[in-house]
Amino acid sequence: MRQMIPDNSFIHQKTTIMKKYMFFCALLTALNSFAKTGDTFSDGGVTYQVIATSEGGGEVAVHSLDPSASLTDALIPSAVSDGGVLYDVTSVSPEAFKGSALRTVVLPEGVTAIERAAFQNCSLLTEVTLPSSLTSIGDFAFAGCASLTSIPLPQDVAYIGRQAFAGCASITHVAIPDGIETIGEDAFLNCSALISVSLPDNMAGVGEGMFEMCGQLEDISLPEGVQYIDSHAFSGCGALASITLPETLAGVGESAFAGCKELASVTVPQNVTGLPDGAFAYCSRLKSVTLPNSVTAIGSGVFRYDQALTHVTLPSWLETIGTGDLGGVFERCDAMTELTIPASVRKIGKMDSFPFGLNSIYVMGDVIPDGLQEMGSRNRMGEDITIYVKRSVYNEKYSSGEWNGFRVDYRIPIKMVNAKGNAVKYKTLCRDFDVDLRHSGDDLSDGTKRLSAYVVDDADGELGMVFMDEILYIPSRLMANVDGYAGEDRYVGVVVRGTPGSTYYYEIGENDYSQGAEGQWLLADAQAVSMTAHAGSNMMRGISDSAYILPAEVDSETGVAVTNYGLNNNAFRKLSGPGWMGYNRSYLPLPEKMAGTNFSMTFTDVDGTTDTIGYEAFINDCDGDDFYDLSGRRTAPTAKGVIVRKGRKVLK
């Protein structure tokens, strides 16, 4: 019988195949235990998505709420595990919690990004805790979270996306972090409860629509270094009563401050070269606007419907006015009664809609701009407006007294009455163009004294006296011909004296070039013509636009602490408190050490005649002083005629 011997090679081959199969199954099982990028899993009521894998771990993003859970308070851990693998939580996915019923959220350290619309329209969300590791907040991330009361932003946040917090109607304060680099447009649009904002020192600008329609915003300080304010940045911030624009500011966007109803005044810094369409439109309480000489273009509708605005001094280098499509620059600024157009203006755009109260336009150039023609020929107000030009321009081109429906004249009236219509002998004056008084005495009726204007040469607090020199030609725009100067111009304030109730006429000075032409006179030039003794000096401060004046302050030109005086009842009296002073007026700042209750006025005319108003106050203050007549003989302070006290001639 034949004995069978087992085939060991076959057994070995079978065993090898089985081992390979078992190894493959084990390998497949091991591979399946590691999730792939994009896989999701749930933990603690929250779904996570794998965004990166590595040996023994990976990263996940918070993806959404687990539909099977009813989570209202989310405490996100810094790491989660799935299948024995630990994943770091590093971001929140787009629309992760959009429209959910979450009330509170705590995000862990390690999260660096909140993606687009992650918490959008979570209307019940009241509190969010963000980690210090956060650097990016995406578009619409918290938009429409109407119950969210605060949002403390970590200092390393560099990016805030478009409309990231738009419609967060309960947030009251926002502090932009130091690490910010980019803020998308409309970032805080319609945060209707927002009251205050803190901006970092390194912030370069305020983006488009950043705080648009933040109707309760009343406190924001722009740091030095801000270079631009983009379009609609503060549009609709109805509670914003004041804002200081930094000297570093170089650009303002369209409608940047439109609808800031409480904004009372604004000073544009000297790096700004133009104001675009609607920049300050619908600012219904705006009273004062100061523009630097650097502004060469003003867009259309810049001040439209600013119904408290009484006057704007246009800068000396201005070239274009209202060349856009929004109508007249001053449309429905119905408190405005006059406008001065500098000689530098080369182009005026659409001017068919002007303030209803406008009655005077002063043209400094050699020709009336064509841009005014449409208003004169089509607007019913044309016949009620007088255009004033220089005497030489009138005689050469407009001697008929009419141009395209306007009256044209060179004689500008001034009536000696106060704001209440009461006849007065003294008024203060400041104009944004040169004033020539050398013909103001022509054709006066019997008993009417000529109109005289005076600068304040000196003041003596011990005597209670203000010493005034007559000036026949009052220059304006004193900085217009200073090379390289682009700041706000300076204007000459004077006191005028005439017969109470009388109407006088002055003219635009022929030397007003408005743009630094060689003929533009300085104060010393004008005083030389007037032959006054103290050329170049004037203590008066002229106001060509309405201004808010404090009773005491540090003088911006001299750096000296001063007390401010206004003319009232024939004497300079201390201002009783802060308040608005109307345009075309002036006031007297005196050093605190010179401050007295009231000051009498001593006038020196061009012919050398001197007289004093408030003489009894002058005498009472002079006990113990020596007085002399013009021959040098000592005399009594009550002597008639001209007497001399401390080198000053006084007429009694």
Task: List PLM regions with ranges.
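Terminal processing/anchoring signals of secreted or surface-associated proteins
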Residues: 18, 35, 76, 494, ...
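Boundary at the C-terminal end of the N-terminal hydrophobic targeting segment
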Residues: 33-40
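A short, polar beta-strand/turn micro-motif
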Residues: 396, 400-446, 476-612
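C-terminal outer-membrane/trafficking sorting elements
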Residues: 454-462, 607-652
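Structural signature of tandem-repeat unit edges
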Residues: 69-91, 100-113, 123-136, 146-159, ...
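Consensus positions within tandem repeat domains that build extended binding/scaffold surfaces
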Residues: 94-95, 115-118, 138-141, 161-164, ...
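Sec-dependent N-terminal signal peptides
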Residues: 21-30
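Positively charged n-region of N-terminal signal peptides that target proteins for export
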Residues: 2-3, 12-21, 652
